[in-house]
Regions:
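Beta-strand/loop-rich accessory regions of lumenal/periplasmic or secreted enzymes
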Residues: 1-248
Length: 248
């Protein structure tokens, strides 16, 4: 698949090629995305670049889940609406058996529908926070962060940090979802994986090839004067020190 990126104002630049690989008997799809820089290095800076997928969300907020890989095989996961607060959620006066509803939720089990709870417990569900967006960002080779926010009008807050994430994310509900792995995630920093619109019927899962959390991609030469070949192997010549045509 070949195409070109188009800005909201209509400008077309950064041609790309997408290759898709399908395997018999497997639900996995491999996608290879390549793009070519064809801009002006002195004025065209890439703020962010990514590939976005839609993920249907069919269940109640507390039956929706997100997860990110951390370092050394670790996983960070959370429900879109965690069932935790000052009061314990219960189904009836006798309790909920061997484990709490909050524990069952963390184990990925189905929590009963809203209508199954009495008025007191519905009030808890009505007032507990839910989260719309999550972002895993690897901005250096040795540090990643996981942040989340409730909505577009409020700030991102930190939830976890570590060294080198393996670049995997999941978004979905207890009936299914979508997993995504960005190859060479920490090696190709600054990169991010973002889950947004998690509280809507269709969430977005975005693999950021260049993270919006980082400084814009600046492909200019590091200096504007020559440093003499006798002193160092560097030179600056008109039309020579240019990134035009490089690809990733």
């Amino acid at each position: 698949l070949e195409g070109v990126h188009k800005s909201p104002k209509g400008r077309e630049w950064l041609p790309f090629v997408v290759r898709l690989y399908f395997y018999g008997g497997s639900e996995q799809v491999k996608m290879v995305h390549s793009f070519v820089y064809d801009g002006d290095q002195n004025k065209d800076f890439i703020r962010a670049l990514g590939v976005r997928f839609d993920v249907p969300m069919r269940e109640a907020l507390y039956n929706r889940h997100v997860a990110f890989s951390c370092a050394d095989g670790g996983v960070w996961s959370e429900p879109v609406q965690p069932l935790v607060g000052r009061r314990i959620l219960t189904l009836d006066k006798t309790g909920n058996g061997e484990s709490s509803l909050q524990q069952q939720q963390m184990e990925g089990k189905r929590i009963p529908s809203y209508e199954a709870f009495d008025e007191k417990n519905r009030a808890l569900l009505d007032h507990w926070a839910s989260w719309d967006s999550y972002r895993l960002s690897q901005l250096t080779a040795d540090a990643f962060s996981i942040r989340k926010r409730a909505n577009d009008n409020n700030p991102w807050i930190g939830t976890f940090s570590g060294t080198r994430s393996e670049g995997y994310a999941f978004a979905g509900d207890i009936t299914g979802g979508m997993g995504l792995e960005l190859h060479d995630f920490w090696q190709s920093y600054p990169s991010s994986i973002e889950i947004s619109d998690a509280k809507t019927p269709v969430a977005a899962l975005t693999a950021w090839i260049w993270s919006p959390d980082a400084e814009p991609m600046d492909l200019r030469h590091y200096d504007n004067v020559a440093h003499d070949l006798n002193a160092s192997y560097e030179d600056v010549q008109e039309g020579m020190s240019t990134p035009y045509g490089i690809a990733r």
